[in-house]
Amino acid sequence: MSDNESEGPTNQTTEPVDNAWSLKIPAFKPEDNPHGLVEESSFATLFPKYREKYLKEVWPLVEQCLAEHHLKAELDLIEGSMVVKTTRKTWDPYIIIKSRDMIKLMARSVPFEQAKRVLQDDTGCDIIKIGNLVHKKEKFVKRRQRLIGPNGATLKSIELLTDCYVLVQGNTVSALGPYKGLQQVRDIVLDTMNNVHPIYNIKALMIKRELMKDPKLAGEDWSRFLPKFKNKNISKRKQPKNKKPKKEYTPFPPQQPESKIDKQLATGEYFLNKEQKQAKRQQERTAKQAEAAKKQDERRNKDFVPPTEDTPGPSRKRAAEDNKVDVQALKAKLMKANKKKERS
């Protein structure tokens, strides 16, 4: 695949491996496929209108990059498509898949400087579709913004912890980097769109990175160190305004409702002839009219009823006379009291 892969002896083993990520991918060299490819393979992908100007500017660099791997690239601005093809000199059978991923990333607004990294052996890409994970558009926009974070801080922290380049564009999230990091990015993105805040996964990745440094904890379970997320937003069914109380269960069927004939039999109306029924109806109608006329008269005469008057209280003059103090009697009383004191 990539010529800049470090050439060194690979430790091939047939025994079980504890950590598959630690294994080195063996380099594929031209000597491994001296006869080249039998048939021509090609892949094409469409790109949006707003990417036309950028792709037109960087296309000479794309052709130069793919020519190093003996691939041919075509840009059709009329149709709005990019095509990559193998040539007779192409010796790597998987490089056409890598170049297909590169043009897909460029169509999803990934810059060429980042997209060309996918041609390396230890680098892959993942385009995560998030448009159909949330039904309501308002929730989708809110959760997608939560993935980016304030001033792109959350996205930057994800990139630092996973060693991947992540780009949120429209209804997709494009990730580019090592395969282990791509798995972590996919988990974070899917959890975020399922209403799990990315800070929980970021904390878990930070804790795992610290635990990896301790060789004593290499063979132990790390679940006790990781934060546990509890969903507090329990969706409750909307309760009706007026609840109907449940009737007591009975094994018997409900009683059959009374029919019109049953009601007439109960009142005795069933046995009356036509004239008697009409007379009864007329009598009921007259009674209703008389009751309604009586209520209407009461409502009309209500305005002519005199209001109740309060009984007059005692006048101010009479109240003042009642409260008047007899000064002469008070003087005589005081003089009498002083004489008693002098005698004693």
Swiss-Prot record:
Give the GO cellular component terms, alphabetically. Answer: nucleolus; nucleoplasm; small-subunit processome
Keyword list (alphabetical) reads:
Coiled coil, Developmental protein, Nucleus, Ribonucleoprotein, Ribosome biogenesis, RNA-binding, rRNA processing
| Major localisation | nucleus
What compartments host this protein?
Answer: Nucleus, Nucleolus
According to the UniProt entry, which residue ranges have a biased composition of type Basic and acidic residues? Answer: 272-303
Residue ranges annotated as coiled coil are: 271-344
Q: Where is this region: Disordered?
A: 230-326
**Residue ranges annotated for the KH domain, each copy included:** 126-194
Question: Which Gene3D superfamilies would you find in this protein's record?
Answer: K Homology domain, type 1
Record-level GO BP terms: rRNA processing
Q: Which GO terms describe its molecular function?
A: RNA binding
Residue ranges with Basic residues bias: 230-246
Pfam family of the protein (one): KH_KRR1_2nd
Function of the protein: Required for 40S ribosome biogenesis. Involved in nucleolar processing of pre-18S ribosomal RNA and ribosome assembly. Binds to RNA. Required for female germline development, cell viability during eye development and for survival of dividing cells and epithelial cells during early wing disk development.
The subunit structure is: Monomer. Component of the ribosomal small subunit (SSU) processome.
Give the matching PANTHER family: HIV-1 REV BINDING PROTEIN 2, 3, KRR1 SMALL SUBUNIT PROCESSOME COMPONENT HOMOLOG
Q: Which family does it belong to?
A: Belongs to the KRR1 family.
* Listed name of the protein: KRR1 small subunit processome component homolog
Q: Which organism is it from?
A: Drosophila mojavensis (Fruit fly)
Q: List the taxonomic lineage.
A: Eukaryota, Metazoa, Ecdysozoa, Arthropoda, Hexapoda
